[in-house]
Design a protein with these regions (language model features):
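Classical protein tyrosine phosphatase
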Residues: 112, 328-351
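C-terminal helix/juxtamembrane-tail motif
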Residues: 1-23, 405, 507-535
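Charged/polar low-complexity intrinsically disordered regions
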Residues: 95-100, 106-109, 114-206
Length: 535
């Protein structure tokens, strides 16, 4: 997950408060010495001989780790290219903005994919400080399968009502940004993508009433911004000191304020629905049925005999943003940019989309049959996945791999994704080919392995194994709804003079956040989405 935050040293964080230690009792450098000693002890206590034998690509000692973290954050792509050249088919270590990581080779993928001692959830909790106040809002969902069950039961194959709400919200967002004019409008692609994905997700997970409520949207954006910034800056501190440090960080204070505001809003929302339910029961009337994330969450907590309140409801929104929003936004932006750069392929995809919408309407069936659009999105994800290293894990118990590498409990691992551009697997792997997976899909077995939502050893864009992204089916539906509107009724192109470039932010390679596109509504729109569901 990408977080646009510069590295910050402990000394910079300390500027926000005053040390109350008498200068005649302790030297001024005493706190720094303590921090360094804690870091030394922690580093060596959590390492082992097998891991220390692996080559480091960006640091050789403890005292160079700060510079190594900053170098990684600014130019991780260059470091990864260097590592792949120096250590092909071998594991290696790297000091990242999140700490030390062991990078495993794709040859080990089948071996680790379902190992119960390698946990995705625990890695996520550690990276985002799940035990620290404010960040701990995610803990309920990390310790249970409620979110996974919600998605499996309600979003694997979205019903017509969900698709219609996604379509209505897409029309609302695009009209808000572009209006009905046929004049070209210059838009920041990152902002447009984030607004589309954020609002479409909110329409389904928080419901029709809240998804356009200004106070909710503002507090939600405020929370996620301060949460990401605070999470990143806490990684500048040795782990044993992070709990203490967070009390003095303005980002963490802002995060808690926004979290409290969200809980207040949701407390009223939960109480309103509860009162409606009780009133209907008392009057002997049929209960009003909701079909959104909060209704699904209430059902799942009830089945488990757990309380349902604003705290749990807020945690649901946090987890959705953490595990899905960034990756979906990233794929939408990259997919749009790839289509802009390949007008011939875009025209073929547009014709396919229009044909399906006219014959099948906007349905799960028509989305399944949009082979070219599906293929183009999967290709964008292959060429530039949301993270350059994927399949993050935390080792929960000592593990010895078949190559002899011993992973001690607490070790953090990533998987190299070089095989997604391996010429032995993909022809012309550096080239974006919209039809690549459509062709594979037409081959025997391709229907189950070459779709956007397919997870295979050769394409791990949504993860692999027991921790593969459960929400990938909903993400695919959301993307196809948004792009159906854009392809059918809008024209878009690069802004004049814009060079397409990519920026490294730690493990993520993003489209330049300043990139803009020109968009206008067609004089004669191809599809009337307001009536397509009436057929």
């Amino acid at each position: 997950m990408a977080m646009n935050s510069p590295s910050q040293s402990p000394s910079a964080i300390q500027d926000g408060f005053q040390w109350e230690l008498p200068t005649d009792q302790l030297p001024s450098y005493f706190p720094i010495v303590c921090i360094m000693l804690v870091a030394i002890i922690y580093t060596f206590a959590s390492s082992n001989k097998s891991i220390r034998a692996l080559p480091y690509i960006n640091t050789t000692g403890l005292f160079s780790s700060t510079n190594a973290r900053r170098a990684w954050f600014a130019s991780a792509g260059n470091l990864l290219d260097e590592a792949k050249e120096k250590y092909p088919h071998k594991p290696w270590r790297v000091m990242t903005d999140l700490g030390e990581r062991v990078v495993l080779t794709p040859e080990l993928m089948e071996e680790i994919r379902n190992d119960p001692k390698l946990s995705f959830k625990e890695g996520l909790a550690e990276d985002f400080h799940g035990s620290i106040p404010g960040f701990d809002a995610m803990q309920f969902f990390l310790r249970s399968d409620i979110l996974i069950d919600i998605v499996r039961k309600n979003l694997l194959r979205p019903n017509p009502s969900i698709i219609k709400r996604l379509s209505d919200e897409t029309d609302f967002v695009l009209s808000r940004h572009i209006g009905q004019t046929q004049d070209w409008t210059e838009l920041n692609l990152s902002q447009l993508g984030a607004d589309l994905v954020g609002r479409l997700s909110a329409r389904i997970f928080v419901g029709d009433e809240l998804c356009r409520k200004d106070e909710w949207l503002q507090e939600s954006q405020h929370f996620h911004h301060s949460w990401f910034m605070g999470a990143m800056k806490l990684h500048d501190w040795p782990r044993p000191l992070r709990y203490l440090a967070h009390w003095f960080m303005p980002e963490c204070r802002e995060m808690k304020k926004a979290l409290a505001a969200q809980r207040r809003i949701l407390a009223d929302y939960v109480a309103k629905r509860r009162d409606e339910k009780q009133a209907a029961i008392s009057a002997g009337q049929e209960l009003l049925k909701y079909d959104d994330g909060f209704a699904w969450l209430e059902q799942e907590t009830e089945v488990r005999g757990l309380p349902y309140d604003a705290t749990i409801a807020t945690g649901l929104q946090l987890m959705i943003a953490l595990v899905s929003a960034h990756a979906t936004t990233d794929l939408l932006q990259k997919g749009m940019m790839d289509l802009i750069q390949h007008p011939g392929a875009t025209e073929q995809i547009r014709e396919e989309v229009l044909g399906q919408l006219r014959s099948e309407g906007m349905t799960a069936t028509s989305f399944y049959n949009m082979h070219l659009l599906d293929s183009a999105l999967k290709e964008s994800q292959r060429v530039r996945p949301s993270e350059m290293l994927l399949i993050r894990r935390r080792v929960m118990g000592n593990v010895k791999l078949s190559n002899g590498l011993y992973l001690k409990e607490g070790t953090r691992t990533w998987m190299d994704t070089a095989h997604m551009k391996d010429p032995a697997i993909y022809e012309n792997p550096e080239q974006w080919d919209a039809k690549r997976f459509a062709k594979l899909r037409s081959q025997p077995g391709g229907a189950s392995s070459a779709q956007l939502v397919s997870s295979t050893r050769n394409h791990v864009g949504f993860g692999y194994g027991k921790h593969v992204c459960t929400g990938r089916f909903f993400a695919a539906t959301l993307l196809k709804v948004a792009l159906s509107h854009l392809l059918a009724n809008y024209e878009w192109k690069l802004a004049p003079g814009l060079a397409v470039d990519w920026v490294d932010f730690g493990n993520t390679r993003l489209l330049n956040p300043q990139a803009t596109v020109l968009i206008r509504r067609k004089e004669k729109p191809e599809i009337d989405f307001s009536s397509i569901f009436d057929a």
